[in-house]
């Protein structure tokens, strides 16, 4: 059973920002933002044609500045946010804005893979997230499964909840909270939990993870020294409401139960340099992706702490007598956690990995040299999980 070869797409600029087009659940589509100091920056809309194993692309100009973070609306295929650098009075500021792509590009491209002659189109600015009083924006996260009207941005030591009004053309600051403590505290990343009616957000600053209640903007849990060095990223298990994963500069990936934060439930130490990204699969939470500046992407099978630790359990009525004994044996033993695959198509630091929002078995990774790689979960594992 041969696996499909990875598909590689090269951007002409350096890049570190990647997101699936979250509201698109039929076509496999990713958005990539570039980081160029000399030229106009771009957002590449990457369409993956699964049947022919080829990539089609469209390019949008992002003239506001180099893109550090990109995030797509869960409700509107055409709307996205970016965090970008701009210079003002010889200072560099990281700002955030909400944009709309041209209507005809929302549902993908029919451009041939090698057609680079077409002119790039520009994004329509819907609104800025005003950060004059709050500092540099680290990231923007959308309310999961929401109507695309609520976002949270992290700016220096502030967590800001925004209401998007008038078709996203106006961002109103609904509430905010600040990190208090010694030194210059700064958020590095955050995720919005899909559980608890979307009332919880987790953030990382320095080596600490914190949970926040978005209704009162108060802290609900705190994991100090979650990592030995800076925490780079975190993600919530989509199927287990108290579980989250974190990764950092100590080369580790840790899994936490927020009801008992004294120590991690599990720790992975497979990378040899900083781990920049951790992502749970949206459907099968045992599948966890990580990307690191050791230039590798690792797919792990964390089945023992997943929502199906005994594998796919079959209903008793569905089992014939001959199968009965075999399946009983199988279901008694929890399956073992392991590294499924290490992907080594990158030659530079991998700053972003993410799953497709349309195909649960497909993911993309992006390295700083502008190389985007599309890979799939190995077929043998896919069928093992499904059957």
From Swiss-Prot:
Transmembrane segments: none
Assembly and oligomerization: Interacts with two multisubunit tethering complexes: EARP composed of VPS50, VPS51, VPS52 and VPS53 subunits and GARP complex composed of VPS51, VPS52, VPS53 and VPS54 subunits. Interacts with SNAP29.
UniProt xrefs under SUPFAM superfamilies: Putative isomerase YbhE
Function: Acts as a component of endosomal retrieval machinery that is involved in protein transport from early endosomes to either recycling endosomes or the trans-Golgi network. Mediates the recruitment of Golgi-associated retrograde protein (GARP) complex to the trans-Golgi network and controls early endosome-to-Golgi transport of internalized protein. Promotes the recycling of internalized transferrin receptor (TFRC) to the plasma membrane through interaction with endosome-associated recycling protein (EARP) complex.
Subcellular location: Golgi apparatus, trans-Golgi network
Protein name: EARP and GARP complex-interacting protein 1
One GO term of the biological process aspect: protein ubiquitination
Top-rank lineage group of the source organism: Eukaryota
Record family assignment: Belongs to the WD repeat EIPR1 family.
Keyword set, alphabetical order: Acetylation, Golgi apparatus, Phosphoprotein, Repeat, WD repeat
Main subcellular location of this protein, as a coarse class: Golgi
Biased composition (Basic and acidic residues): 322-335
Modified residues (Phosphoserine): 320
A GO cellular component annotation in the UniProt record: trans-Golgi network
Positions of region (Disordered): 310-335
WD repeat start-end pairs: 4-48, 55-101, 124-164, 172-214, 219-258, 263-302, 338-379
Annotated positions of the N-acetylmethionine modification: 1
